[in-house]
Amino acid sequence: MTVTAPNALNFECETGNYHTFCPISCVAWLYQKIEDSFFLVIGTKTCGYFLQNAMGVMIFAEPRYAMAELEEGDISAQLNDYEELKRLCLEIKRDRNPSVIVWIGTCTTEIIKMDLEGLAPKLEAEIGIPIVVARANGLDYAFTQGEDTVLAAMAARCPTSTAISDPEERNPIQRLLNFGKKKEEVQAQSSQYHPHPPLVLFGSLPDPVVTQLTLELKKQGIKVSGWLPAKRYTELPVIDEGYYVAGVNPFLSRTATTLIRRRKCQLITAPFPIGPDGTRTWIEQICATFGIQPQGLAEREAETWQKLSDYLELVRGKSVFFMGDNLLEISLARFLIRCGMRVLEIGIPYMDKRYQAAELALLSQTCAEMGHPLPTIVEKPDNYNQLQRIKALQPDLVITGMAHANPLEARGISTKWSVEFTFAQIHGFGNARDILELVTRPLRRNQALAGLGWQKLVAH
């Protein structure tokens, strides 16, 4: 089925079999991001094996996540769910004493209809630790949506200003920027900001990237009131009705919906700060929302592109095919088209056209400016059909999930794991180089092998 959008982008929906990680993998980066948390995944042995393989076995460190393994007694309702979870949570409290316990529901808890949302408030009151329930199960479209589910649950837990005596104390980034300064200096610095409604940014990013984006907005006179998630659960941002929110990742549509509907926030619809072009447009949209004239962004973007010139020479004219895995595909395709690459197809497990509207508009604009034909966006791609198209098109690079990387390499097609873009620092002006470092690695390897004369794999 083909749908032609008003901006002439072609959308196809194949509803086929595609491969992506399980969303419970979000625990891998969220437990590191929220330092005072403990993640309890409630599932079967399969979930436990997956977590061990996906995150590695930590021998010397005690990780802040665990597996509550469902047994036959749980599934046949012979055991009391409440008592079993209470026993585990009391053990976690005794050993780790976290500020929050996050229960991660799985496919099995969905199938046996475990009422985690009903159990959590009673247990929370009994043990005295907040319990957040997130259904990050394999019924989702992509593994990154696990983070979306957790952040949507946490958005409902963000305090209001009436419940907090000093909201500024809950802003760790602001405290970091003001560290070592006298009170008078802090007050003088706060006068540099333009008057605007409070702004909260949502999306889990490494701390250096959080600081970079906060400083980029500070240069424009925009103060970030907080980030969701914060580094600590006790520092979740204050969110009141009428606050403005902006996302930094394309897979956070549930969180955006929760902030709009339940917390009555205003969503700033903007492309995502991936690549110099996306970062500039993201900042411009936030400035435009607050009626602020952006300063020096064109120069900042031009300077970044200049620093990328060595990589741009490598990728210009090369073709890339996205099989679809982590919902970053539209943003990455738009950036690579701006770099001079040819995008043959954008496969994506799920497309929220409202949340990604600004990103799709920027993709169309980028194609027009670069003289690139509008790529076809295939939602829920059928991997079998994709493999036939890859065989016919012979792209220089395929960005794919792990399942297809080795089979494609065996057929002489260069691949890059899409999961690497999830874990790499790809946001902001300064990190565009990291994206191109990942993209060009297979291309540079091919060049090096060709230089050695090793162009064919010979089987004996």
Curated annotation (Swiss-Prot):
Role: Component of the dark-operative protochlorophyllide reductase (DPOR) that uses Mg-ATP and reduced ferredoxin to reduce ring D of protochlorophyllide (Pchlide) to form chlorophyllide a (Chlide). This reaction is light-independent. The NB-protein (ChlN-ChlB) is the catalytic component of the complex.
Family membership: Belongs to the BchN/ChlN family.
Stated name of the protein: Light-independent protochlorophyllide reductase subunit N
Pathway connected to this protein: Porphyrin-containing compound metabolism; chlorophyll biosynthesis (light-independent)
GO molecular function annotations of the record: 4 iron, 4 sulfur cluster binding; ATP binding; metal ion binding; oxidoreductase activity, acting on iron-sulfur proteins as donors; oxidoreductase activity, acting on the CH-CH group of donors, iron-sulfur protein as acceptor
Oligomer and partners: Protochlorophyllide reductase is composed of three subunits; ChlL, ChlN and ChlB. Forms a heterotetramer of two ChlB and two ChlN subunits.
UniProt keyword terms in alphabetical order: 4Fe-4S, ATP-binding, Chlorophyll biosynthesis, Iron, Iron-sulfur, Metal-binding, Nucleotide-binding, Oxidoreductase, Photosynthesis
Gene Ontology BP terms: light-independent chlorophyll biosynthetic process; photosynthesis, dark reaction
Gene: chlN
Annotated [4Fe-4S] cluster binding sites: 22, 47, 107
Catalytic reaction(s) noted: chlorophyllide a + oxidized 2[4Fe-4S]-[ferredoxin] + 2 ADP + 2 phosphate = protochlorophyllide a + reduced 2[4Fe-4S]-[ferredoxin] + 2 ATP + 2 H2O
Cofactors (names): [4Fe-4S] cluster
Keyword Glycoprotein applies: no
Enzyme class, first EC level, given as a word: oxidoreductase
Lineage: superkingdom: Bacteria
Database matches in InterPro entries: LIPOR_BchN/ChlN, Nase/OxRdtase_comp1, Protochl_reductN
SUPFAM superfamilies: Helical backbone' metal receptor (SSF53807)
Cofactor remark from the record: Binds 1 [4Fe-4S] cluster per heterodimer. The cluster is bound at the heterodimer interface by residues from both subunits.
Pfam families referenced in this protein's UniProt entry, alphabetically: Oxidored_nitro
EC assignment: 1.3.7.7
Matching CDD domains: Pchlide_reductase_N (cd01979)
